[in-house]
Amino acid sequence: MVSEKNTPVAVVMGSDSDLDVMRGCIEQLESFGIKPIVRIISAHRTPKIAAEFAQNAAENGIQVIIAAAGMAAHLAGALAAQTSLPIIGVPLTSSAGLGGVDALLSTVQMPPGVPVATMAVGKAGAKNAAIFAVQILALADENLRKKLADFKKAQEKKVIEKDSGVL
């Protein structure tokens, strides 16, 4: 686990079963040179730890928190209630869930004044959460802005190459 000081992004998930999906998020962040803090903290089973983590995040150098959970996915909202840092929510599917719809609604339906930027359910949402975190950080970081521009150009190039290969 990376030290909880001086890294700008934390990736927090409600269960170790979420790690498989969130690995894509972690790898996407690392591709931009960001080694995130990775934690397993449950909004329901470890609420005090969740509150303390969020309350101390800014003083520990964290600038953005990515929170992933399935089922009654309250993790992102519970963290958002305890900090003014941007929270990016990633709803996940679960074996006991409703295809991720339950987690999506739990993550996106926040009361006024407690915002959570909610991504798509699952792997696409995990990767987009990383990219969105980089976009937030790039507002004040010229190096990240360049890496982000290079990333977008590489995506464009891949699509153009695939298009030219279609019969």
Language model: regions and residue ranges:
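N-terminal beta-loop-helix "entrance" segment that forms/cooperates
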Residues: V38-E59
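Glycine/charged-rich beta-loop-alpha catalytic/anionic-binding loops adjacent to active sites
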Residues: T7-P8, I34-V38, L85, Q109-M119
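Glycine-rich phosphate/pyrophosphate-binding loop and the adjoining helix
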Residues: A129, L137-L167
